[in-house]
């Protein structure tokens, strides 16, 4: 089949799936889902009733039928095409499976199956099919280059950062779309109200990442001779991402019709970010770096950037993910929008303050390590005293914010985390024993306690389990990094496990602690806090983690070690995301 015909079929299927999503939202808003008592048609109601809601319901079912045919036609076309072997066939099959599931869920709703389960799958299945279709189209439209570009130095770093940001933006948009879609089954939030806080938070996070990616793409991307015409428009096309994100966010505050606006905008944003991510992953670009321009950065911007870097934003991002997701899985129900905002502000200030104090205390170590020697304090751009005072100010502000706007217990745990990391770990533990990572893991495991107590004001068994998951996740994650950077640690005199016990013992300990962590990750199900949805996610994610840990132990090369280190970051975020999904869907 010709490439143009194949693409036309796939685009028609994508458009019909979007029409299915929009018409389905219209059915829910108008409360016309119950006017038809039969499936797939409702001819009796159509003949006997003059109710216009019947036509809305029938229109939705028509779009479902047309989209189902188009999706499976696209699947057949992709499999018959000789140019689409591999990943596009898989994603096309996933799209067809999800769409079939959502169609069956719609039938179950009419037949009287428990509405919560069927309703979630009905809309979520369509959204997941839409995402898989978008990925299929992007993979076919943007083929892998025969000779991948070779970048080095700062340009390669920029490329990795922008690619990672693009995929995170796509993931965030997908979560936001599912959050909006699931709101109809959240107790206390009917479809005739504005979007509840969980959806607003998800949309806001997706909007933030999308805007960031759009700005970075416009600022950094430079086309080269091999850049195809489709990708040349990416820097300009990226401006539509903030517009879609803003539209999705604004729709969250408009009753009734706002749901339709938000759902449409976030679905389009999801498709757009997926396409952008594939383009950035596969298309050759050059990247403008800080040294490429003739204009130097103003002094005040450099100072601000240095102080921000003291807070270690990359490290903080994962801490805030665990804090945020924890807030949505407590037994207290969904937190308010303002509680989420103030907890995130307080959490950033606490983690940032501890990070700045760490930079002040560790400057003698950082200067001897290639990974950290260019930080502001060891390089002399900021004095140790200034870094310490800055960290102290942020820490005090964090306690005030959390105490005033959340709960005293959340402020207490934030203070405990600051002392644990900035003084106990940095000042003594890190320099004294190879068990620094094991014991020090408690510092990184405190953010879920902050999020939990900010919502509930108390600590429960589930909060302790969340602490334990991160506590046992920390050793395999950081020991993998220590294996890669063991020469730096040896030169700086830091007794990390690879320096003290060698590579073989470190690889074995990584496997052992990985197994413990995966076992601990199943405890939420054992104590009755989570259900089968989280169980499936935890098992799948855990098996992948154990596979990578096994590769580190048996093979032990740099590729295996880096693979585990990078996946461990994604693993932790996805495990907590699976808990949120379980709580929102099952309750």
Curated annotation (Swiss-Prot):
Molecular-function GO term, any one: oxidoreductase activity, acting on NAD(P)H, heme protein as acceptor
Major enzyme class: transferase
UniProt-annotated stretches for the region Protoheme IX prenyltransferase: 318-587
Keywords: Cell membrane, Heme biosynthesis, Membrane, Transferase, Transmembrane, Transmembrane helix
Keyword ATP-binding attributed: no
Catalytic activity from the UniProt record: heme b + (2E,6E)-farnesyl diphosphate + H2O = Fe(II)-heme o + diphosphate
A Pfam family it matches: UbiA
GO annotation, biological process: heme A biosynthetic process; heme biosynthetic process; heme O biosynthetic process
Membrane-related topology note: Multi-pass membrane protein
Entry's localization field: Cell membrane
Gene Ontology CC, one term: plasma membrane
Chain segments carrying region Unknown: 1-317
Ranges annotated as spanning the membrane: 9-29, 58-78, 93-113, 123-143, 172-192, 195-215, 238-258, 260-280, 315-335, 337-357, 386-406, 409-429, 437-457, 464-484, 522-542, 560-580
EC number: 2.5.1.141
UniProt-listed InterPro entries: COX15/CtaA_fam, Protohaem_IX_farnesylTrfase, UbiA_prenyltransferase, UbiA_prenylTrfase_CS, UbiA_sf
Pathway assigned to this chain's UniProt record: Porphyrin-containing compound metabolism; heme O biosynthesis; heme O from protoheme: step 1/1
PANTHER family xrefs: 4-HYDROXYBENZOATE SOLANESYLTRANSFERASE, PROTOHEME IX FARNESYLTRANSFERASE, MITOCHONDRIAL
Stored HAMAP family: CyoE_CtaB
Family recorded in the similarity comment: In the C-terminal section; belongs to the UbiA prenyltransferase family. Protoheme IX farnesyltransferase subfamily.
Biological function: Converts heme B (protoheme IX) to heme O by substitution of the vinyl group on carbon 2 of heme B porphyrin ring with a hydroxyethyl farnesyl side group.
Note: Carbon 2 of the heme B porphyrin ring is defined according to the Fischer nomenclature.
This protein's name: Protoheme IX farnesyltransferase
Organism, scientific name: Chloroflexus aurantiacus (strain ATCC 29366 / DSM 635 / J-10-fl)
């Amino acid at each position: 089949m010709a490439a143009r015909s194949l693409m036309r079929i796939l685009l028609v299927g994508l458009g019909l799936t979007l029409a299915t999503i929009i018409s389905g939202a219209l059915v829910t808003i108008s409360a016309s889902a119950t006017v038809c008592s039969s499936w797939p048609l409702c001819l009796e109601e159509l003949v006997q009733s003059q109710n216009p809601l019947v036509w809305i319901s029938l229109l939705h079912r028509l779009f479902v039928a047309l989209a189902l045919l188009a999706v499976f036609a696209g699947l057949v076309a992709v499999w018959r095409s000789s140019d689409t072997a591999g990943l596009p066939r898989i994603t096309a099959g996933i799209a067809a499976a999800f769409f079939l599931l959502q169609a069956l869920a719609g039938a179950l709703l009419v037949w009287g199956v428990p509405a919560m389960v069927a309703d979630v799958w009905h809309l979520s299945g369509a959204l997941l099919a839409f995402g898989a279709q978008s990925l299929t189209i992007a993979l076919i439209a943007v083929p892998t280059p025969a000779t991948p570009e070779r970048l080095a130095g700062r340009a390669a770093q920029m490329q990795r950062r922008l690619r990672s940001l693009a995929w995170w933006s796509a993931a965030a948009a997908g979560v936001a779309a599912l959050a909006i879609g699931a709101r109809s089954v959240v107790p206390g939030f009917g479809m005739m109200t504005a979007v509840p806080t969980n959806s607003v938070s998800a949309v806001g996070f997706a909007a933030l990442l999308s805007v960031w990616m759009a700005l970075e793409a416009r600022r950094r991307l430079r086309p080269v001779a091999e850049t195809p015409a489709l990708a040349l428009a990416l820097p300009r096309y990226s401006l539509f991402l903030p517009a879609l994100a803003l539209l999705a966010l604004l729709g969250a505050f408009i009753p009734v019709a706002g749901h339709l606006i938000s759902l449409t905008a976030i679905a389009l944003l999801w498709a757009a970010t997926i396409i952008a991510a594939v383009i950035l992953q596969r298309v050759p670009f050059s990247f403008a770096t800080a040294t490429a321009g003739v204009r130097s950065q103003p002094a005040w911007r450099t100072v601000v950037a240095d102080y921000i870097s003291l807070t270690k934003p990359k490290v903080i991002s994962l801490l805030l993910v665990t804090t945020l997701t924890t807030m949505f899985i407590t037994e207290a129900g969904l937190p308010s929008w303002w509680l989420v905002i103030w907890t995130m502000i307080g959490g950033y200030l606490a983690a940032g303050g501890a990070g700045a104090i760490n930079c002040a205390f560790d400057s003698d170590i950082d200067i001897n390590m290639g990974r950290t020697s260019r930080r502001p304090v060891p390089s002399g751009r900021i004095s140790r005293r200034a870094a310490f005072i800055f960290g102290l100010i942020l820490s005090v502000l964090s306690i005030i914010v959390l105490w005033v706007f959340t709960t005293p217990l959340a402020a207490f745990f934030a203070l405990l985390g600051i002392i644990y990391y900035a003084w106990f770990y940095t000042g003594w533990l890190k320099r004294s024993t190879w068990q620094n990572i094991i014991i020090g893991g408690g510092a990184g495991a405190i953010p879920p306690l902050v999020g939990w107590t900010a919502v509930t004001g108390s600590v429960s068994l589930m909060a302790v389990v969340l602490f334990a998951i991160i506590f046992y996740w920390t050793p395999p994650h950081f020991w993998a990094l220590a294996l890669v950077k063991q020469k730096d640690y040896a030169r700086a005199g830091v007794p990390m496990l690879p320096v003290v016990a060698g590579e073989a013992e470190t690889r074995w300990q990584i496997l052992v602690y990985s197994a413990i962590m995966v076992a601990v990750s199943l405890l939420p199900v054992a104590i009755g806090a989570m259900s089968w949805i989280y169980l499936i996610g935890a098992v799948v994610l855990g098996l992948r983690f154990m596979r990578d840990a096994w590769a580190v132990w048996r093979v032990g090369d740099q590729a295996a070690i880096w693979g585990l280190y990078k996946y461990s970051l994604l693993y932790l975020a996805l495990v907590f995301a699976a808990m949120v999904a379980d709580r929102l869907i099952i309750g």
